[in-house]
A protein has these predicted regions:
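Hydrophobic alpha-helical membrane-interaction elements
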Residues: 23-29, 34-35, 96
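Short, surface-exposed interaction loops/tails
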Residues: 117-157
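A generic fold-level signal
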Residues: 1, 38, 116-118
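Extracellular/periplasmic head regions of type IV pilus-like filament subunits
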Residues: 51, 55-127
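Membrane-proximal N-terminal amphipathic helix
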Residues: 32-59, 86
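N-terminal single-pass transmembrane signal-anchor helix
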Residues: 1-27
Length: 157
Protein backbone atom coordinates (compact mmCIF):
# COMPACT_ATOMS: atom_id res chain seq x y z
CA UNK A 1 0.00 0.00 0.00
CA UNK A 2 1.39 3.33 -0.98
CA UNK A 3 0.50 6.70 0.66
CA UNK A 4 0.98 10.27 -0.39
CA UNK A 5 4.48 11.61 -0.71
CA UNK A 6 5.63 14.67 1.17
CA UNK A 7 5.67 16.72 -2.05
CA UNK A 8 2.08 15.79 -2.86
CA UNK A 9 0.94 16.80 0.63
CA UNK A 10 2.78 20.13 0.42
CA UNK A 11 1.19 20.87 -2.97
CA UNK A 12 -2.30 20.15 -1.60
CA UNK A 13 -1.66 22.34 1.47
CA UNK A 14 -0.39 25.18 -0.74
CA UNK A 15 -3.49 24.98 -2.96
CA UNK A 16 -5.80 25.01 0.07
CA UNK A 17 -3.92 28.01 1.49
CA UNK A 18 -4.21 29.90 -1.79
CA UNK A 19 -7.94 29.21 -2.09
CA UNK A 20 -8.60 30.23 1.52
CA UNK A 21 -6.77 33.54 1.07
CA UNK A 22 -8.94 34.34 -1.97
CA UNK A 23 -12.11 33.54 0.00
CA UNK A 24 -11.04 35.67 3.00
CA UNK A 25 -10.20 38.60 0.72
CA UNK A 26 -13.65 38.38 -0.86
CA UNK A 27 -15.35 38.26 2.54
CA UNK A 28 -13.43 41.31 3.75
CA UNK A 29 -14.45 43.25 0.64
CA UNK A 30 -18.09 42.31 1.20
CA UNK A 31 -17.92 43.44 4.84
CA UNK A 32 -16.43 46.78 3.80
CA UNK A 33 -19.19 47.31 1.24
CA UNK A 34 -21.83 46.41 3.83
CA UNK A 35 -20.44 48.93 6.34
CA UNK A 36 -20.39 51.66 3.67
CA UNK A 37 -23.96 50.78 2.65
CA UNK A 38 -25.05 51.18 6.28
CA UNK A 39 -23.34 54.58 6.46
CA UNK A 40 -25.10 55.77 3.30
CA UNK A 41 -28.42 54.47 4.60
CA UNK A 42 -27.89 56.22 7.95
CA UNK A 43 -27.17 59.54 6.22
CA UNK A 44 -30.28 59.20 4.05
CA UNK A 45 -32.45 58.39 7.08
CA UNK A 46 -31.15 61.37 9.04
CA UNK A 47 -31.59 63.56 5.95
CA UNK A 48 -35.23 62.49 5.69
CA UNK A 49 -35.73 63.10 9.43
CA UNK A 50 -34.22 66.58 9.12
CA UNK A 51 -36.45 67.34 6.12
CA UNK A 52 -39.53 66.26 8.07
CA UNK A 53 -38.40 68.36 11.02
CA UNK A 54 -37.83 71.37 8.74
CA UNK A 55 -41.26 70.90 7.19
CA UNK A 56 -42.88 71.17 10.62
CA UNK A 57 -40.65 73.78 12.30
CA UNK A 58 -39.25 75.80 9.37
CA UNK A 59 -35.58 75.13 10.15
CA UNK A 60 -33.09 72.31 9.86
CA UNK A 61 -31.55 73.23 13.22
CA UNK A 62 -33.12 70.86 15.71
CA UNK A 63 -34.28 72.72 18.83
CA UNK A 64 -32.87 71.37 22.06
CA UNK A 65 -29.93 69.79 20.26
CA UNK A 66 -27.31 72.46 20.79
CA UNK A 67 -27.07 74.15 17.39
CA UNK A 68 -29.46 76.96 18.17
CA UNK A 69 -31.65 78.74 15.67
CA UNK A 70 -28.72 80.34 13.84
CA UNK A 71 -27.11 77.02 12.95
CA UNK A 72 -24.06 75.09 13.90
CA UNK A 73 -22.00 71.98 13.42
CA UNK A 74 -20.91 69.00 15.43
CA UNK A 75 -21.03 65.26 15.95
CA UNK A 76 -24.41 63.83 15.00
CA UNK A 77 -24.70 61.37 17.88
CA UNK A 78 -22.49 62.85 20.58
CA UNK A 79 -24.06 61.82 23.90
CA UNK A 80 -24.70 65.29 25.26
CA UNK A 81 -27.00 65.45 28.25
CA UNK A 82 -28.09 69.08 28.10
CA UNK A 83 -28.71 69.79 25.30
CA UNK A 84 -28.94 66.34 23.73
CA UNK A 85 -27.26 65.41 20.44
CA UNK A 86 -29.06 66.08 17.16
CA UNK A 87 -29.74 62.41 16.45
CA UNK A 88 -31.05 61.75 19.96
CA UNK A 89 -33.37 64.75 19.75
CA UNK A 90 -34.71 63.50 16.39
CA UNK A 91 -35.40 60.16 18.11
CA UNK A 92 -37.04 61.93 21.07
CA UNK A 93 -39.32 63.85 18.68
CA UNK A 94 -40.24 60.72 16.71
CA UNK A 95 -38.45 61.54 13.45
CA UNK A 96 -35.92 58.70 13.82
CA UNK A 97 -36.43 55.22 15.23
CA UNK A 98 -32.94 54.96 16.72
CA UNK A 99 -29.73 56.95 16.93
CA UNK A 100 -27.58 55.98 13.91
CA UNK A 101 -24.08 54.83 14.79
CA UNK A 102 -21.20 54.40 12.36
CA UNK A 103 -20.33 50.65 12.17
CA UNK A 104 -16.71 51.27 13.13
CA UNK A 105 -17.27 54.18 15.51
CA UNK A 106 -14.95 53.90 18.49
CA UNK A 107 -15.93 57.13 20.24
CA UNK A 108 -18.65 59.77 19.97
CA UNK A 109 -16.19 61.97 18.06
CA UNK A 110 -15.40 59.46 15.32
CA UNK A 111 -18.80 59.00 13.70
CA UNK A 112 -21.13 61.12 11.61
CA UNK A 113 -21.06 64.92 11.56
CA UNK A 114 -23.81 67.45 10.87
CA UNK A 115 -23.90 71.11 9.87
CA UNK A 116 -27.19 72.95 9.77
CA UNK A 117 -28.69 76.34 9.11
CA UNK A 118 -32.33 77.33 8.94
CA UNK A 119 -32.39 76.67 5.19
CA UNK A 120 -30.04 73.72 4.59
CA UNK A 121 -27.92 70.98 6.12
CA UNK A 122 -24.92 68.79 5.34
CA UNK A 123 -24.27 65.34 6.82
CA UNK A 124 -20.76 63.86 6.75
CA UNK A 125 -19.36 60.33 7.00
CA UNK A 126 -16.10 58.50 6.45
CA UNK A 127 -16.48 55.72 3.89
CA UNK A 128 -13.95 52.91 3.64
CA UNK A 129 -14.29 52.87 -0.17
CA UNK A 130 -15.17 56.47 -1.01
CA UNK A 131 -16.14 57.63 -4.49
CA UNK A 132 -13.28 59.07 -6.61
CA UNK A 133 -14.39 62.62 -5.81
CA UNK A 134 -16.26 63.88 -2.76
CA UNK A 135 -19.69 65.23 -3.66
CA UNK A 136 -20.10 69.00 -3.60
CA UNK A 137 -20.56 69.70 0.08
CA UNK A 138 -19.85 73.40 0.06
CA UNK A 139 -23.55 74.28 0.08
CA UNK A 140 -23.25 75.56 3.63
CA UNK A 141 -19.84 77.13 3.10
CA UNK A 142 -18.12 74.40 5.11
CA UNK A 143 -15.20 73.03 3.12
CA UNK A 144 -12.78 71.64 5.71
CA UNK A 145 -14.60 68.64 7.20
CA UNK A 146 -12.88 66.38 4.70
CA UNK A 147 -9.42 67.50 5.79
CA UNK A 148 -9.98 68.49 9.42
CA UNK A 149 -11.98 65.42 10.43
CA UNK A 150 -11.17 62.85 7.74
CA UNK A 151 -14.67 62.87 6.27
CA UNK A 152 -14.80 61.80 2.63
CA UNK A 153 -18.52 61.70 1.86
CA UNK A 154 -21.49 63.97 2.48
CA UNK A 155 -25.06 64.70 1.52
CA UNK A 156 -26.56 68.18 1.48
CA UNK A 157 -29.92 69.80 1.12
Amino acid sequence: MRGFTLIELLVVIAIIGLLSSVVFASLNSARTKARDAKRLSDLRQVGIALALYQDQYGTFCVAGAGAGSSGGMGWLNYPYTNPVGVAQQLVNLGYLGAVPVDPTQTSPTSGYMVYCTATNFTLYATLENPPPAMPNCTLNGITDYDTAYGKNYCISQ
